[in-house]
Structures are given as structure tokens and as C-alpha cells.
């Protein structure tokens, strides 16, 4: 059964993003009040704010967790044109703060000349890497060569997307058959510009990222984008949040059918398109197995989508902030840990501005 818990976040302005850690027991929120808050889940299921601090000198658009293999590490990005990496430090035995934790800024990434609109850590098999995207259309990929020293980050790649960028998503596949891949969404409002989702793939020969595909059917501003976790599939699934919810499959073509430059080409199909929110869709998030998608929109609901055995995607649940499910087909899906995604998305619904993220 779905239970909605209202959390008095105590942010002084709009909450733009909510992010859960790998285990789903820690949560980070960020806001236009320039702060980030960290929340821990107690044994009785209640969330308690354990840290709150001013992170930037402008609205904080996104916050995200690194894999716990690298410690308790957060990244944030802001209208102030920077991204920052934070690490939780627990007081040592000779410290007055023994056993107490606090968050320390390890680095500030200052390469962008415009608002940094999204930040995402790469899948852990790639090492400690971080991607940012900016309103000026540049995606930057950084690497921490020494995971024990988070103050040193080197800029590895700059990708010019030619369109203002609003969101990014790494392909989580760890298969050696799949090169590192990142999807970029644009919130450019011009209806004349098609292809507001671009896919970039790492080329081992050139050691650079090159554009593999453009989803020409996406012509409306994109607010969020998410590759599904890949548990042995030979193809990729990508969800896009725009004026509706869209789900694409990307099936790699055989190398001899791909371009001679070595970039993989894909057979792309729109397998689902839903306008049930009847409004802008702000967030899309997959469960851990990549079988259930949660979306949130300006209608104040979180909607859950799942494919049946015929690969037909259907809505299996509608969740409202007051905890009341709408419809009757939602039972049985919580075994796939959609609850955290739903809660994350509901918080995003409550705080995401409809004015976009380029201007404060």
C-alpha cells in the first residue's frame, strides 16, 4: 500500500530536486534558497534533517549522490554557474565533534559561463566521474583520478550540443558490448528546432564523445531524461519528460551497418507516449530493475508505468500527495522499490518551478 508522508522541509523557497542515495535511506534536497539539506530515515520510517548548509550563491537546480563505494559524496549545480562536490566527514576520536558528521566542500567546478542545469555521477564501473550540462549547450565530463582526494578533478571532455541543455542521463549499462553513453535533453522553447534529445557515445579510437543519435521526434522542451537500468538487455530504454511522458527503445545496429567513424547507430522506436498528466512533466525515474517508470507532472500526481508481457506500456497507478491512490491497478508494484522514486518525484512536483532553470 502506498503511504504518503509529508515532510516539513523548511526550505525558504522552491525545492527543485530530491535525490535518494543508493540504499534509499538517505535523501538530499536543494532549493532556490541556495541550500542543500540531507535527510536520514529512522527505524520507524520517519525522515530527519541531519545537515543543512548554504551551497551556492544562486538557485540550486540539482543534487545527486555518488555510489557509496566512493564514500558519502554529493554533487550540486546552480544558477551561479558552478557545480560543487561535497563529502561527509565524521569527527575523529580526538575531536570535540566525535561521531558527529558534517559536509565539506571538496571542489568547485567553474568552467561554465552560464547556469549549470544538471549534474550526474557516471556509473561506478567507470570510476569516479561527473557530468554537468549548462544553459549554453555544453556538457562537461570530469574525473577524480584519485578517489581518496576529491579536491582534484580534471576536465576530460567538453561536448558542444548547440542547444541549451536542461538535463543529462548516463547509460548505466556495464556491459563491455556497450560504450559509455550519455543522453542530453534541451529545454529550448523554439518549436522550429527539432531533436531536443541527443545521444553521445564514447569512441575508444578517438577517445572522444561523438553524437550517435538525435531523437528528432522530440520537439518540445525537455525537463528530464532517464536511461533505464540495463539488466542484461541487448537494447537500451530511455524515458523523456516533456509536455508528456515518452519511452524510447534504442537497439544497436550491427557494426557493419554503423557509420565508418565507429559510432554505434541505433534503431529507435517510440514504444509509449502518454499525456495523462495533461500538463508539463517534470521528472521521470526508473525502479532498480528498469521495469517500472515513475513520472511527475504539474497535475500534482506521480504516475507509474509498466510494460506487460506484450511489451505494451500501461499506467499501473496514480499517486496523489495526500496518499490517496487514483484507480485500482496499482497493487503489487512496490516490490521493485518504486516507492522511493515516487516519493522523490512527488517532492519534485511540489517544488519544481514551471519557469524553467535558466533564469533565477
Curated annotation (Swiss-Prot):
Chain positions of WD repeats: 10-49, 55-96, 111-152, 160-210, 217-258, 276-315
UniProt activity-regulation remark: The GATOR2 complex is negatively regulated by the upstream amino acid sensors CASTOR1 and SESN2, which sequester the GATOR2 complex in absence of amino acids. In the presence of abundant amino acids, GATOR2 is released from CASTOR1 and SESN2 and activated.
UniProt subcellular location: Chromosome, Centromere, Kinetochore; Nucleus, Nuclear pore complex; Lysosome membrane
GO cellular component: cytosol; GATOR2 complex; kinetochore; lysosomal membrane; nuclear pore outer ring; Seh1-associated complex
Gene Ontology BP terms: attachment of mitotic spindle microtubules to kinetochore; cell division; cellular response to amino acid starvation; cellular response to nutrient levels; mitotic metaphase chromosome alignment; mRNA transport; nuclear pore organization; positive regulation of TORC1 signaling
Similarity field: Belongs to the WD repeat SEC13 family.
Function description: Component of the Nup107-160 subcomplex of the nuclear pore complex (NPC). The Nup107-160 subcomplex is required for the assembly of a functional NPC. The Nup107-160 subcomplex is also required for normal kinetochore microtubule attachment, mitotic progression and chromosome segregation. This subunit plays a role in recruitment of the Nup107-160 subcomplex to the kinetochore.
Subunit structure: Component of the Nup107-160 subcomplex of the nuclear pore complex (NPC). The Nup107-160 subcomplex includes NUP160, NUP133, NUP107, NUP98, NUP85, NUP43, NUP37, SEH1 and SEC13. Component of the GATOR2 subcomplex, composed of MIOS, SEC13, SEH1L, WDR24 and WDR59. The GATOR2 complex interacts with CASTOR1 and CASTOR2; the interaction is negatively regulated by arginine. The GATOR2 complex interacts with SESN1, SESN2 and SESN3; the interaction is negatively regulated by amino acids.
Protein's recorded name: Nucleoporin SEH1-A
Native species: Xenopus laevis
